[in-house]
């Protein structure tokens, strides 16, 4: 079982339709975006089951040169039986940062490290999903706030 370390900005989600939730409790959201996704899964009639951080994926961290474990944000199954592993990330973490403006060297190194780490995790997640017949998707603020 995954050990959980609580951070000050974490928030617990309590489902309105607990019969749809197939994960462990408490449901911890590490961002308002994750909380919004929980609400969407919980209230969307096409979602028949969902969980938070319910899958454990081994991946190779190319920066630390070792294997690590990745817990994607969500799993969801829809009425059509399509299954997804879903990660919620800021758009800025989805591309290699470009040096512009007054960004410090330290900031650039951290952003590059985040991008590379995400690339490693997502590569493993795509293979994991392929093996299970699932689809892996990353949702960014552009997806979350489209049409709002």
Where are these regions (language model features)?
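Electrostatic, structured charged patches in enzyme active sites and in nucleic-acid/phosphate-binding
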Residues: 1-148
């Amino acid at each position: 079982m995954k050990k959980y370390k609580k951070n000050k900005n974490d928030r617990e989600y309590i489902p309105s339709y607990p019969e749809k939730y197939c994960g462990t409790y408490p449901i911890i959201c590490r961002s308002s975006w994750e909380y919004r996704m929980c609400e969407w899964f919980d209230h969307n009639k096409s979602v028949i089951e969902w969980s938070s951080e319910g899958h454990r994926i081994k991946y190779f961290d190319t920066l630390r040169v070792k294997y690590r474990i990745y817990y994607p944000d969500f799993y969801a199954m829809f009425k059509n039986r399509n299954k997804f592993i879903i990660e919620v990330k800021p758009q800025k973490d989805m591309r290699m940062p470009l040096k512009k403006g007054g960004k410090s060297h330290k900031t650039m190194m951290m952003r590059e490290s985040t991008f590379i780490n995400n690339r490693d995790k997502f590569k493993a997640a795509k293979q994991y999903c392929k093996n299970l017949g699932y689809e892996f998707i990353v949702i960014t603020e552009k997806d979350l706030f489209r049409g709002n």
